[in-house]
């Protein structure tokens, strides 16, 4: 069984002692406790501070004792990478600062952006504290020192990555920085690469505790960093090593789980059978943390209503788009409609009362649809058949579909894996899983001209999806829909053909996991793809009327509050606003 014990109280305690939280300025940290860093310069002290660095992956801003901003801080990225990507609508009802993000109308004074900036630098600050303290712990062995500092550097790179994909240029702040007022002159992938190379070279393969970043998790982050830099040959070397030898921190070799949906099951996550996880945001329930450790970042993304007969306490956010749902259709060969997936639509119950009859879509579908999207008439995990409109906050605003991957099973409530608020649970968020390694490898092989090998990697993922043991079933054991999926059997002959197939596969496999927007930007196709999406989706959702994606929307604005807070005494700005804002 998964080890649900977390060190949350220790981490909060340690962070308060050394004053990790941000006050007026995002890194202007003043001690607020009675113990100094010197008091933490012990083996147990530095481990406690390291645990605090991991704690930030939950998205909750422990530094100020609040869960405020957890939805935009969470590395599930449902706000910045989901509702901006064409995969999802904001959901709930009209209005709010998230609507501006969804419509590509973010302004520098958007408080959600300030939350994300402060959160990323809070995490970076925690990692820097670990590195500074570890250097002065007298009785650490060489192996212990390398393990602690390797984890801290991998985490620092992770926080920087999730800040970079949102804001672009960031200031570099490390353990030796004395003045936090540093310029944001360029993208910091080289600094992240150096941190990750150190982690890859120095971290052990195994740990006794669930959730710690090991050698191969660092390698995976490094490979992704190299892909972002288009260092294809270097990335291939790392990716090939991961595929050949990569193991989780229990020493079990990475491989795809036999059943796709087991990635999103509490009873599988963290066990020896969990061979696909590379890095999870570790969540727990009923651990005396006032629900802080239970995935606050996705706490809004449940069916609306909060009744005992449905999961969650609220709130109907992050609703899959019709465009995404249509992408799961398959043709007579069991392949996706890559170039015209919106030519025909998956049937939905828009405007149909839950008490009225409804016939589900009868065409062939990729089976991953019903592990990704909640739709009328299909079992919603073990909560019974999705009733449609009764669980939707406002169909007219955001449509008839609901998220599924972030939702716990009803059985999890009876096994104490759900917190009393019913909006948080022990269901981890997969930050990085082995399927993404295969997709990154496919991308690299395409860039290097190895189309056949790229197709092999993509087909591994499609073969797993085709496993009938992983299909959603009706109570009588029959498939819940007409599932039909096949592998690619005709060779890809051009780079464009291979790219198009690989990118479509990545959308389907990782749908609603917060990656797509950043991939579209990285591939240089965001403007074309997202404006095409808006032209289609606005015919379904009037709230998108007038929205458009412009060149500068590839990154978000630097929060004005941070620009103001980091001015020099003479009024000179150290942070520059991104172009177009």
Where are these regions (language model features)?
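Bacterial Sec-dependent N-terminal signal peptides
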Residues: 2-6, 18-44, 192, 223, ...
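Bacterial N-terminal signal peptides
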Residues: 11-19
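Short acidic-aromatic linear motifs embedded in glycine-rich loops, typified by GG[WY][YF]DAGD(H)
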Residues: 23-151, 155-166, 171, 176-177, ...
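Structural signature of alpha-solenoid helical repeat junctions
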Residues: 141-148, 155, 188, 207-214, ...
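Hydrophobic, small-residue-rich alpha-helical packing segments that form membrane-like cores
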Residues: 172, 176-267
